[in-house]
Curated annotation (Swiss-Prot):
HAMAP family: ATP_synth_beta_bact (MF_01347). GO terms for cellular component: plasma membrane; proton-transporting ATP synthase complex. Produces ATP from ADP in the presence of a proton gradient across the membrane. The catalytic sites are hosted primarily by the beta subunits. Keywords: ATP synthesis, ATP-binding, Cell membrane, CF(1), Hydrogen ion transport, Ion transport, Membrane, Nucleotide-binding, Translocase, Transport. It is a peripheral membrane protein. It holds the Pfam family ATP-synt_VA_C. It is found in: Cell membrane. Its main location: membrane. This is ATP synthase subunit beta. ATP binds at residues 156-163. F-type ATPases have 2 components, CF(1) - the catalytic core - and CF(0) - the membrane proton channel. CF(1) has five subunits: alpha(3), beta(3), gamma(1), delta(1), epsilon(1). CF(0) has three main subunits: a(1), b(2) and c(9-12). The alpha and beta chains form an alternating ring which encloses part of the gamma chain. CF(1) is attached to CF(0) by a central stalk formed by the gamma and epsilon chains, while a peripheral stalk is formed by the delta and b chains. It catalyses: ATP + H2O + 4 H(+)(in) = ADP + phosphate + 5 H(+)(out).
Length: 469
């Protein structure tokens, strides 16, 4: 076994010298297993990042280096970090190294483990079929539909509802489609991960989900690699079992952020806004593995934190290039009490074309967007001169646009304990017919508040009856 010694420790970055002259390869895992002077055991894994010359490698630690000292013996495992894959991962919670961190005991030693670094599928293996994934969330299904095997970004600043939307999607897809999900918590709050685990356990969804966490309090090495751990588990379900898998990453920005921290510690020159020079490469290596093949698909839904709501920041801008659909969350809508706060004009999808969604769906979606766009243009006039100065035609546009805006909101299953209202799953055909009828003026006489936080158009009629009673 190839052994070396720690020569330098800079927080999460550790230099190791191998005297035999046989250096471990880049991405190899090195381990330390011993106790320090206080009797506390040190059990650490490092990943080789650079060969410095002089028989020394620079590595990144996957957990805290507290208690580590120079001269500590390090062992080269001879392979990359590998994690458990297959049905054994379902219903369990893991860390970046594939160790179980729930209370259900360790994973059996003989279980299959795959390395977290691997090549993207070959070009000829990729599937070109385009199929819509129904989410049951009206604003998404109507205006920015998700593609099976596609990549979807949920963009938004702090506290606009990205994680709640992800939780609802996990719930809807498990309940309605019975699919397998892998959830990778990348650099987010431990409390949210804990809440999500307990909610999923209560609803029974956890049986179909594998969860991997590298939270905010962990070193950058773990936060940078945990997305690859989750992706490796998802790839096994796709390639070996032919499944259609959902991969949730919350939050992809923290992946970039961790990469930036590691890059600075490794001594690389920073590029724009202080990000790592390898930003586009690292993002590409992750995203290119998330795809549909002839065997199965991985549909990935990624929350993207937008620093200071600035979409031109290199981190969200680099992520944009890889996405098939974007769901933009807007703080202005949360202030109006419209949840989910999805911006119907800024959200996009490659799938919103008549060849994919059908002529009727496409026409209704475009009319909804035109009505909302016209309302947006009229808002300045209304603010200065008031509604009375508008033409009759424009008054009607405003009247319908407000109903459409409220009808795009919806009550979520995962928010039942906050709202006290039952969550709703709305099939696409009901969504399209509901908006078509609003555009035709069928519900012009109903009060606009009846359209708030409802599922189907039938609920609107019921609400209106209660209000008018």
């Amino acid at each position: 076994m190839n052994k070396g010694r720690v020569t330098q420790i800079m927080g999460p970055v550790v230099d190791v010298k191998f005297d035999g002259g046989k250096l471990p390869e880049i991405y190899n895992a090195l381990t330390v297993k011993q106790s320090n002077e206080n009797g506390a055991s040190i059990n650490l894994t490092f990943e080789v990042a650079l060969h410095l010359g002089d028989d020394t490698v620079r590595t990144v630690a996957m957990s805290s280096t507290d208690g580590l000292v120079r001269g500590t013996e390090v062992e080269d495992t001879g392979k990359a970090i590998s994690v458990p894959v297959g049905d054994v991962t379902l219903g369990r919670v893991f860390n970046v190294l594939g160790d179980a961190i729930d209370l259900d005991g360790d994973v059996p030693a003989d279980v299959r483990r795959d390395p977290i670094h691997r090549q993207a599928p070959a070009f000829e293996e990729l599937s070109t079929k385009v199929e819509i994934l129904e989410t049951g969330i009206k604003v998404v299904d109507l205006l920015a539909p998700y593609i099976k095997g596609g990549k979807i970004g949920l963009f938004g600043g702090a506290g606009v509802g990205k994680t709640v939307l992800i939780q609802e999607l996990i719930n809807n897809i498990a309940q309605e489609h019975g699919g397998i999900s892998v959830f990778a918590g990348v650099g987010e709050r431990t409390r949210e991960g804990n809440d999500l685990y307990h909610e999923m356990s209560d609803s029974g969804v956890i049986k179909k989900t594998a969860m991997v966490f590298g939270q905010m309090n962990e070193p950058p090495g773990a936060r940078q690699r945990v997305a690859l751990t989750g992706l490796t588990m998802a790839e096994h379900f796709r390639d070996e079992q032919g499944q259609d898998v959902l991969l949730f990453i919350d939050n992809i920005f923290r992946f970039t952020q961790a990469g930036s921290e590691v890059s600075a510690l490794l001594g690389r020159m920073p590029s724009a806004v202080g990000y790592q020079p390898t930003l586009a490469t690292e993002m590409g290596q992750l995203q290119e593995r998330i795809t549909s093949t002839n065997k199965g698909s991985i549909t990935s839904i990624q929350a993207v934190y937008v620093p200071a709501d600035d979409y031109t920041d290199p981190a969200p801008a680099t992520t944009f290039a890889h996405l098939d659909a974007t769901t933009n969350l807007e703080r202005r809508l949360t202030q109006m009490g419209i949840y989910p706060a999805v911006d119907p004009l800024a959200s996009t999808s490659r799938a919103l074309s008549p060849e994919i969604v059908g002529e009727e769906h496409y026409e209704v979606a475009r009319q909804v967007q035109q009505t909302l766009q016209r309302y947006k243009e009229l808002q300045d006039i209304i603010a200065i001169l008031g509604m009375d100065e508008l033409s009759e035609e424009d008054k009607l546009v405003v009247h319908r646009a407000r109903r459409i805006q409220f009808f795009l909101s919806q009550n979520f299953h995962v928010a039942e304990q906050f709202t006290g209202q039952k969550g709703s799953y709305v099939p696409v055909k009901n969504t399209v017919s509901g908006f078509k009828e609003i555009l035709e003026g069928k519900y012009d006489d109903l009060p606009e508040d009846a359209f708030r936080l409802v599922g189907s158009i039938e609920e609107v009629i019921e609400n209106a009856k209660k209000m008018m009673a």
